[in-house]
Each structure stands twice: as C-alpha cells, then as structure tokens.
Amino acid sequence: MDTPERESIEFDVVIVGAGPSGLAAACQIKKQAAEQGKEVNVCVLEKGAEVGAHIFSGAVIETKALDELFPTWKEDGFALGQPVAKDEVYLLRDESRATELPHWAVPPSMHNDNNYIVSVANLCRWLAEQAEELGVEIFPGFTAADVIFDDNGKVCGVATGDMGVGADGEPGPGYTPGMDILAKYTILGEGCRGHIGKGIIKKFALDSDADPQHYGIGFKEIWQVPESQHKPGLVVHGSGWPLSKGMGGGFFLYHAENQQVFVGLIIDLNYANPHISPFDEFQRLKHHPIIAETLSGGERITYGARAITKGGLNALPKLSFPGGMLVGCDAGTLNFSKIKGVHTAMKSGMIAADAILEALGTDAEEKGTTNFQQLFEQSWAYQELYNSRNFGPA
C-alpha cells in the first residue's frame, strides 16, 4: 500500500528530552535571546505523554542553577519542595544494627544546608510552563528515533519515530510516519540511557580521552506514612548492609511534603556476584529498623527504577559535536560525591544555550561548531566535578 511521505519542520534549535537539562537550555535560550533582541525558534521533543511522565525522581537538589535561571522563583510563588531540616548518615552493620556518623565525620559534599527535597517531575512541569510562556514549542509524545546528518556529516536535526508499525516492521492500518525536525543546532538531553547520545559519542569518538563510564541502578519508592512517623525535611543517607563485600552503593530516605517519604537504594553495576538481585536487596533494606520505623503502617503509592551515570569528570566525554551538544546525564554531569545531578544538569543546559546564542549568525553556525566545551570548563559546574573527580575511584 502507499505510505504517506515524511514531513519536515525547521527550527533554530531542537532539544531532545524535557528533563532538567533540556528545559533549562530552552528557557535560557529564549530569555537571553529576548534580552539581546534576537528571535530564536526552539523546539523540545519529549517521549512521554506529558512533561514529567517519564521522570520518577524524588531528590535533594541545590538551587544554584535555578537561582541563576529564574532569580525570582520564590517571589513568583513556585513551591519547589520541602526545605531540608536535618541530615543523618548511617552505616548499617547488619540486618538490625546501625551506627550513626557524627556530623563532623560526614563529607562536606553531603551536607544539605539550604537544599530542598523535591519531585523532579514537578520541577520539570514548572520549567515547561516557563518555557512555553517564553515561546518554546514543546511536543510531548514524540520520540526522537535518530539524528539526521547533512552532506558534510554535520547533525542537522532529528527524526521522530513512525507510529502504527506492525511486529514485522511493516506499516499497519494506523500507520503514521514520523517527522524530520531540522535545526541549526541539536541539544541531546535524553538522560543516562539516551540511545541517540550513545550513538553520537561512538560516531565522533567523544569519549576517546575519557575513562570508561560507570553506571548504577537506583530503585525508588514513594510512601505515604502516618503523621507520627513523618519528619518533614529529614534527609537520611547510608551504606553497608544489605550490600555485601565488593558491592558499591547506598540508600536514601527523604521526608518530603504531605506525609510522603522517598526511599531508595543505589547499587553500582560492577558487582562480582552474578546471582545478586538488586531488587531483592532493596526489599531486604526496607526491613532494617532505620527504614522500617518510618515505613511501618504506611502505604507504597508508586515505585520504579532508573539507570544512573556516575563516572564523573574522569568519564565525561567531549560535550560538543558538529551540529550539537550533549547535556545532563546524556553526558554524565552527576556529582556523585553529593549524590546530586539536577543542578549540574541544568547548568550544562544553560551553558549550551549561551554557546548556541553566541554561534548563531556567525561562521560557526555554518560549521555547526560552538565554544560550549570551553564555556563549560570555565563554569562552576565543571569546577564542582573537578573537585570531586577522585571521589568514586578512591
């Protein structure tokens, strides 16, 4: 049967992924362009049915990047989340015993003064609202299937996936072809498992001077707990049991707003015992008194898991390629010494935006180049990753 032809649409910038890095990039481009009297068309592609649909994360975040992007977010009434009130760090010795580390023994990078316990999905929804008010076009429900190259090998956009394809790979009754989203610059902010970013890193050998990337898996649940067991603003981290010798990782327990608690376990994916089940280790963890005293009598309301890019600066690839750049977890900007990555992801997107604005309308635009790498290496985000570069390897 005859199949419809693919259509195309052109923008100045296309951003793949409506996560913290991609949305921060979109907002920064439009804000700075307006200040400079420029008109820049920006499109954000999001595979989820809505922004935040594929983001399951309760996190403790620093507001440094948010403060730079929207200095008046507090005055504007954005309820970011629960301010951190207290830090606790434990070493779990076995299934029933634990030792709390004194505050002076906890690395400064894990102190959470002035930080917030937030829903990253809610943060992204708010950023998306700001982006749309600034004129960004956000297309939810569109998956970027591959990049598009021009005749010179420069990335010139992305192709969205076809819909209505049968199991045999042939068009079915409801077949709808994808679209070619063409752009002068393409920002990849897909997250840790971004397949387009992985392909770009390989094609342009962006990781040729970097260490192999390190990965972990994080299990997370959100619980509604009794009011008597809820301590708003309490942040608990720990390591040890149930992880055995040779297994890296740790747990977290965050007391958020509305009697909700975020609990999870992160396990490095280099464990030697092939019979280990990370999911079952997480279930064991919840029976430890340190965790159980909070969850007892509560109700689990949602759960999930995600991969984590945790190699840090030593495993960070080059961030620029002809026609585009990598931001956030697509590159690996998580600061593992802080167990935080939202602020550095947002900053990487904001720097990418600044680099693109500098390049548009110049000879660099024709070549698809920017000074993103240089700008990133001059930023506080890079300095933060540099300062913690030996935390994981040590």
Residue ranges and their predicted role:
Residues 1-16, 20, 135-139:
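Glycine/serine-rich loop-strand microenvironments at binding/catalytic pocket rims
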Residues 305-336:
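FAD-binding beta-loop-beta segment adjacent to the flavin cofactor pocket
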